[in-house]
């Protein structure tokens, strides 16, 4: 059955040469038994073809349409992740890395919320979240974070590790996202600490409901985190936020997360980073400008 699954995937694969010998493999409809099929772009560093014996760490990134190409990104401004990684690797500042850009769907809001935190929400908060999801085009009506992670770990990562020369252990497997994508990246590392050794969460949308006067959803997530904290001895986390736009409301929430992480044994500027970027807003342009910081934390030599 697995052979049929992988063979089917290869039928959808399109190899596109990117700048300076990087290669992007696009799978237009990556199938899943847990969530709707979606596009996945897999960027191989130029070192991949240069040394056939070398294996590479892998970074799984959310909102994949905004990760690599300006043409597919919101407001035509991507994170420019591939070129940033290539430049840093060429300067010997980071290890070369495979980037897996996972496109979102209309179920984004439900897929990216840390599902186990929902048990600490009120019925009214859950109802409001379902209404928000509807405005985004989702008709599912249930939280989908656990199923999304099953897809990520049990299907996508299996395919990537089978198809490419990856370093498969947790130490070399990281996950990254912004806003709600930051929440699911944290959740992935907490739910699957044996799979993801590092998580980078930019402009993490702790308030969830876009209401800075209601702190309960943020508290619900922290309750979950406190009960499921990965061991600090072999995990690393990066958090940040700006001070403009939507990011202006994140500071108090992030400070409480910082306190929780430090109480749990994480060491600031060692295996834990928390940063504030003055004036940065809640958009791809801002995340693009500081993505090098993320890569240096995850893969710096």
Residue ranges and their predicted role:
Residues 22-301:
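Non-catalytic cap/lid and distal C-terminal segments of serine-dependent acyl enzymes
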Residues 1-4:
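Positively charged n-region of N-terminal signal peptides that target proteins for export
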Residues 15-21:
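Sec/Tat signal peptide C-region and signal peptidase I cleavage site
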Residues 7-15:
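Bacterial N-terminal signal peptides
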């Amino acid at each position: 059955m697995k052979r049929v699954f992988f063979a089917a995937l290869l039928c959808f694969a399109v190899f596109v040469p990117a700048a300076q010998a990087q290669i992007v493999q696009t799978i237009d409809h990556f199938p899943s038994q847990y969530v709707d099929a979606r596009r996945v772009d897999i960027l191989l560093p130029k070192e991949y073809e240069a040394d056939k014996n070398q294996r590479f760490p892998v970074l799984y990134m959310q909102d994949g349409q905004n990760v690599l190409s300006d043409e597919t990104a919101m407001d035509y401004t991507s994170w420019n992740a591939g070129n940033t990684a290539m430049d840093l690797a060429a300067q010997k500042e980071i290890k070369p890395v495979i980037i897996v850009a996972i496109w979102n769907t209309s179920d984004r809001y439900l897929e990216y919320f840390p599902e186990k935190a929902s048990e600490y929400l009120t019925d009214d908060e859950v109802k409001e979240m379902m209404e928000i999801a509807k405005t985004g085009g989702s008709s599912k009506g249930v939280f989908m974070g656990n199923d999304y992670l099953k897809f990520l770990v049990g299907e996508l990562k299996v395919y990537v590790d089978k198809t490419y020369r990856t370093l498969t252990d947790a130490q070399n497997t990281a996950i990254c996202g912004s806003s709600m994508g930051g929440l699911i990246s944290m959740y992935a590392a907490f739910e699957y600490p044996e799979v993801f050794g590092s998580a980078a969460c930019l402009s993490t949308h702790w308030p969830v409901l876009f209401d800075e006067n209601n702190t309960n959803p943020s508290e619900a997530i922290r309750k979950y985190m406190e009960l499921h904290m990965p061991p600090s001895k072999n995990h690393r986390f990066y958090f940040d936020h700006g001070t403009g736009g939507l990011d202006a409301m994140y500071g108090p929430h992030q400070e409480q997360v910082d306190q929780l992480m430090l109480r749990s044994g994480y060491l600031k500027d060692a295996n834990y980073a928390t940063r504030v970027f003055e004036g940065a807003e809640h958009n791809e342009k801002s995340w693009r400008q500081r993505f090098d910081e993320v890569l240096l934390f995850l893969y710096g030599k």
